[in-house]
Amino acid sequence: MAIDTSLPKDIRILQAAEEVFSQHGYEKATLDEIIALADVGKGTVYKYFGNKEHLFYKLVADKNVPFLEKLHQAVNSVDSFEDKLKKYFEVMVHFYVANSTLWQIICFEMLGGTNGCRVEPDGDDFKVIPRYNSVKVSEETSERILRYHKILHDEYNILSQLIEQAMHDNLLKHDTVPEITTKFVFFGVAMSIFNQSDDIAADMTDEEAARIITDHFLRGNAR
């Protein structure tokens, strides 16, 4: 991949970062490779982004903002619960296929699983706790994990609100637990895309994928 050297340096760095992170993941990606691809000096990267983690966060956060806007616009463009689900999943499938590797990095490298941590609700907020007694979570690690958790939470919270409203409108079973149901569906779709994104992109439109996901959620596979 060649980067247009007429672009502003920060844009070149972000484009190079997306290429390198997508090829190597977070841990194995190096700033040196990003710097070489962007054709900038090392000091320029530190000037704009500080370090590798801040650069990766800037990259995915900048993608997340318009994604959230599209999700909100999609669900607000129709009236029925079923149509809102279809629109939500159309946008989600399109985005996750296009950004599969970067969002896999968020889920598998940045959320603390490899550090023996997990995120739990803490009142109206969230907290990071160790999975094992031997794990000590530093403040820096906790802050990093929560930054990436917020990205995913903001995405699936839109779906959660749809499910909660559907329960209020007596459209779902009364024993439905919104948080569990939301995560089950959201991360089930995400993991399917992570493992089969090429097949989904080649063989199925976003609309068809969304129709199948919505139909299975509302009706299951029963005859």
Residue ranges, per PLM feature:
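Amphipathic alpha-helical packing segments from all-alpha helical-bundle domains
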Residues: G116-D169, E179-K183
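Basic, helix-initiating cap at the start of DNA-binding domains
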Residues: M1-H24, K28-V40, H54
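C-terminal peripheral helix-coil segments that are non-catalytic and often amphipathic
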Residues: H94, N157-D169, K183-R223
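Base-recognition residues in the alpha-helical recognition helix of bacterial helix-turn-helix
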Residues: S22, Y46-G50, Y57-K58, D62
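Short, hydrophobic secondary-structure boundary micro-motifs
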Residues: Q104-I106, H174-D175, S197
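Amphipathic, non-transmembrane alpha-helical scaffold segments
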Residues: F56, V60, N64, L85, ...
